[in-house]
């Protein structure tokens, strides 16, 4: 940029000098000197000559004076025509002009040099402050960059040192992972071996199962053949049973006739007997109304005794518990070993069955006669297969007549056999296999088995099927008491007994 400014200033000075020289030349020309102008390219040369006499006429020349002058200078023939004095003057003028031009050149150079130095000094002074500011800014930026580079170098060194410190741990972790990988590969190989062994065993099992299946199919075919033969035999047996049933119906008719005769005979004997003691009672044997009277008479041992129930044709053997919870209890039901079948009809449950010393049902009619003449309470004792015992006691107990379907009525529950009664308290009729009196279309006596006071199958049934442990669970038709062991647990033992309230 400085060189361009210097060149510009030099050009301006040269123009000024040239204009000054031209002005001087014009002034001298005005003084009476002749001028000679020579044009060479972009340059123009002016020569001052003294005035001379007119030249002799010559050939016609071009109107262009510059061209004429150049040709007169270049052509020696024309110069030869000039007078010698004029030539000398011209040469002298040329020399003077040359010297003057050299002086002018030196002067111009001197002036330009001084002017250039001044301009350079001024420009240097004008640009020193910005350059200093620029240098300071560059220095600050350089310092900041150096600091950043120093920080980055320190961070890099820290990271490098941390990586160097972590290299042993990384190496150990890598070794550990390699060892684990080897162990996993070994385990995988072991599992592959076990898998192949299992596949072989599976193939062997499949082969064995196919063989067993073939054997089962063969046995099935044999069983089907046997079943067809047995079906034919059963058909023959059914035919025989029809004949036996026919004979049995005849025997039942005869038995019914005999029973009627026996009742008539007993009626006749009773009419002739003494009112205080029936004729068929053994001499010396004392008869009581229930076990409470037996205990009041002085008996203290529990066992089988004879009682005379009102409206009964003969005395009944009953089991009296004279020790439990104050005694005086007359047993009306006992289950303890499953020796007696409780899947009975209405008539059996009415008259009673079993042995009073063991499993038995005293009979609905006897219980009705006992509870008809006095107010009784009921006690139910239960035992599970784990040896746990519980009881349920009802303060008032009454059983209706046969016309009332031996309807049950109990009031005042207490005991340890559940938070509430598993026995329906009021107006529940008795049902058996052949007399469905429950409030359900499903015939609970057939589904739950036995005879009981079912109310939509209810929460209890102590006359169900006797199941021995461990087959006593999940049995809906077993000996059940819901609030003691749940709805499907069949109990080990149960007792039902009654006694008068005035005791």
Swiss-Prot record:
Coiled coil: 84-238
CDD domains attached to this UniProt entry: FReD (cd00087)
Gene Ontology CC annotations of this record: collagen-containing extracellular matrix; extracellular region; extracellular space
Gene Ontology biological-process annotations: angiogenesis; blood coagulation; cellular response to hypoxia; negative regulation of angiogenesis; negative regulation of apoptotic process; negative regulation of blood vessel endothelial cell migration; Notch signaling pathway; positive regulation of angiogenesis
Pfam families: ANG-1 (PF25443), Fibrinogen_C (PF00147)
A GO MF label: receptor tyrosine kinase binding
Disulfide cysteine pairs (residue numbers): 291-320, 444-457
Entry keywords, A to Z: Angiogenesis, Coiled coil, Disulfide bond, Glycoprotein, Secreted, Signal
Chief location of this protein within or outside the cell: secreted
Residues glycosylated per entry: 96, 126, 140, 158, 247, 274, 311, 337, 427
Residues annotated as domain Fibrinogen C-terminal: 282-502
Residues in the signal sequence: 1-24
Subcellular location: Secreted
Superkingdom per UniProt: Eukaryota
Tissue specificity statement from the Swiss-Prot or TrEMBL entry: Highly expressed in the lung with much lower levels found in other tissues.
Job of this protein: Binds to TEK/TIE2, modulating ANGPT1 signaling. Can induce tyrosine phosphorylation of TEK/TIE2. Promotes endothelial cell survival, migration and angiogenesis.
Subunit structure: Homodimer; disulfide-linked. Interacts with TEK/TIE2.
Protein name: Angiopoietin-4
């Amino acid at each position: 940029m400085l060189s361009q400014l210097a060149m510009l200033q030099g050009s301006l000075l040269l123009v000024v000098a040239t204009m000054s020289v031209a002005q001087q030349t014009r002034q001298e020309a005005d003084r009476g000197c002749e001028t000679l102008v020579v044009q060479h390219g972009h340059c123009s040369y002016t020569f001052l000559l003294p005035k001379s006499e007119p030249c002799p006429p010559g050939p016609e020349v071009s109107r262009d004076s510059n061209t004429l002058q150049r040709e007169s200078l270049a052509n020696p023939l024309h110069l030869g025509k000039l007078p010698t004095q004029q030539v000398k003057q011209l040469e002298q003028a040329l020399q003077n002009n040359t010297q003057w031009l050299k002086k002018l050149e030196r002067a111009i150079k001197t002036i330009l040099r001084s002017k250039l130095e001044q301009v350079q000094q001024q420009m240097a002074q004008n640009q020193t402050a910005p350059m200093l500011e620029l240098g300071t800014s560059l220095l600050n930026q350089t310092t900041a960059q150096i600091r950043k580079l120093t920080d980055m170098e320190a961070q890099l060194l820290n990271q490098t040192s941390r990586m160097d410190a972590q290299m042993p741990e990384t190496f150990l972790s890598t070794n550990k992972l390699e060892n684990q990988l080897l162990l996993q590969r070994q385990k995988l190989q072991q599992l592959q071996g076990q898998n192949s062994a299992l596949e072989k065993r599976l193939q062997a099992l499949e082969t064995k199962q196919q063989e067993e299946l073939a054997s089962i199919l063969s046995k099935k075919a044999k069983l089907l053949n046997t079943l067809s033969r047995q079906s034919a035999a059963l058909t023959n047996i059914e035919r025989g049973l029809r004949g036996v049933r026919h004979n049995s119906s005849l025997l039942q008719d005869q038995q019914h006739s005999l029973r009627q005769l026996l009742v008539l005979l007993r009626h006749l004997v009773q009419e002739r007997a003494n009112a205080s003691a029936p004729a068929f009672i053994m001499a010396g044997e004392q008869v009581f109304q229930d076990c409470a009277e037996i205990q009041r008479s002085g008996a203290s041992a529990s066992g089988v005794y004879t009682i005379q129930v009102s409206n009964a044709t003969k005395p009944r053997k009953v089991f009296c518990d004279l020790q439990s919870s104050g005694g005086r209890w007359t047993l009306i039901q006992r289950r303890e070993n499953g020796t007696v079948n409780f899947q009975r009809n209405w008539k059996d449950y009415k008259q009673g069955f079993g042995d009073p010393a063991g499993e038995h049902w005293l009979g609905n009619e006897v219980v009705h006669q006992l509870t008809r003449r006095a107010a009784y309470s009921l006690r139910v004792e239960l035992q599970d297969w784990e040896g746990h015992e519980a009881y349920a006691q009802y303060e008032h107990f009454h059983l209706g007549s046969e016309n009332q379907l031996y309807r049950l009525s109990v009031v005042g529950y207490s005991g340890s056999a559940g938070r509430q009664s598993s026995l329906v308290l009021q107006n529940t009729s008795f049902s058996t296999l052949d007399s469905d009196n429950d409030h359900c279309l499903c015939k609970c006596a057939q589904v739950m088995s036995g005879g009981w006071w079912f109310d939509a199958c209810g929460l209890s049934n102590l006359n169900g099927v006797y199941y021995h442990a461990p087959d006593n669970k999940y049995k809906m038709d077993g000996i059940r008491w819901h609030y003691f062991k749940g709805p499907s647990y069949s109990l080990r033992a149960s007792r039902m007994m009654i006694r008068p309230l005035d005791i």
